[in-house]
């Protein structure tokens, strides 16, 4: 039975029994405690916790899941995989143990021609929790499972919880006996390789408290209602129904193995080591495609790191199998072909998935060889010194410079019999993060110590921000810092940081830079505010200089921002939102914001994309943005619950932690984002947006630079002036410029070719004369000399090789020519095969010459290049070459 049919029968069976079919949620968990969805119940977690009332009493789903804790075991065992599909049925206060058990038995044992899976009841074994008499009674008396095939196990095996206080309960597992060829008999309590678990029924009826381990926690009492959460591993059931040895050989996986064998020429089943690599490739490529399909892009943190890690393991294992060229596209295509029937969105999104995967493959292949060489050298050095642990600094170098995930280094070191100093590696990583954090903080505050700000916050409370509705107001100074130290007062000329009880100044955050302005103290003192930061939550710090008078803590003040500057920043920030939405419209949801900076009249916007955005797409994005400006759309901000924001479709990183209340900025019917920044009131106030271009700032991240309003107009005006000047030079209209400039460049290229031809002729003429000057040194035809100054390195090399080629008759030949370029000596030396057979290598000769010239050089045995600092020593260098030829020639 094909996997797609297993899935169809599952959903059909439960739908016929009153369950609502719920589509698989994204692998990107809508839960700040999870990177990825690891189980079928995760999307239903709010219902089990009682946070949200379920819209139906019964539900069923086939949920995409990813688990990576046992990634090193993938391929080595038949039970570990990173991607799997969890078939689940759920009851929220409806049926309980008897209903769940009855449904499960019916679906598993009903003959296939009657809609079931047709498993032999005699091969099914049951485990129940140690004290769960009720479940055992149902299995034995209601279902008819013999008592000898029901086993009781403890909390570790048959009691489920999420690992934290919350819902929990005993569970009952259904296991399938694969037969004596898989090990000794005795049931799942004895051999879980032979008696493989296929279905877990969780009877969620209690609430657990704190605990120290999986089987050590307190049961606090009953839940308000009893729930059912079951999970059947589709891949494990497919393994049984398709009669194969392991999960890697089922229909949706075997096709990938076959493609990998086709690409490498290594047959599956030929050897244990190659089989492990083939299974790793199969599992990891399936997982990669599903993750990319759900919007994950490779990166160095979070779920992006998970994807990068498994993709690079797959690529490296293909290299171990003998692949030499790119392989990812072929593997991606076969995964989509296999999984597309169940998840048609993979087919429609094929181009984007391929683009992301190919970009990661290209990035890794650039560093794989060099990184592997670094690792091999480190391993050799470690072994030579008698060590068994690869130093942490080597692992850090591989990660930081060559993009090797630490897991890959661990694996490759283990293959050579070494462990890795993980503590040392993590210490260096921590130091790097702390340096970056301190650098970023010191750039904002001038120092990295935040204690003074916290003391002010503890004493005076958080700053009341009034800047959404006011640009000026009355305030009280509650804190003064001079050189990062709290002070009761500051005087004229002091650089200060002022904390107010209330302020209209926006503190840098969310990509928007801080406001500037003035603080006028009641005593007459004036502070010019040059920046506003929020170094700790809730504390607004106004950085500036006391221009007049003395400032004291507790003084009343009139504060005002630079309104013109604020408006220019607001235009940039609103334009950023429009750009974000236009990019998502053009490229899809993966063009998610990765960073931004909004300044007066200009902004930059970073977003996820595996490759450069075509110019035509950028043009369309810019046009769409400016069309929105012309629609005079209102811009509104509203504070609401995070759940309401999600419901309204507001763009946000919902994997991040937000408070219960969030601010949502809506631009007409075009854009809706969570945002704490300041904005225009209407899109017409932006005037004009001009995208200057986009570029790469890292793997999978692109950056757009843009201008807004008057700055955009001034840019276009300058461009118009430049175009007019070019028109005057080439005597053409604007629309003719590309053709005319192209023609001029063509003529220039032709002229360069003609110059190159003359240069080549000059080299040939010089070569003929040099051959005639060859000197016989112990049977070696030695040509030496100095050619005119200014001869390029390429021309000198071309001349040397031409002279070498003109020495006929099989005579051993050495050609050593010198010149000066930019006042510094340069030499190229070449030997023919006959000379090399007599022990003369170009690299050795160049090093001897370059040493005399006060420099260095090297190259291959047949041709090498060197240079130095002393052109006056060229004659001595020629003599050094001749001496070495005389001494070395055999």
Curated annotation (Swiss-Prot):
GO terms for biological process: alanyl-tRNA aminoacylation. It catalyses: tRNA(Ala) + L-alanine + ATP = L-alanyl-tRNA(Ala) + AMP + diphosphate. PROSITE patterns: AA_TRNA_LIGASE_II_ALA (PS50860). CDD domains: AlaRS_core. The keyword Nucleotide-binding applies. It holds the Pfam family tRNA_SAD. This is Alanine--tRNA ligase. The lineage of its organism: Bacteria, Bacillati, Actinomycetota, Actinomycetes, Kitasatosporales. The gene is alaS.
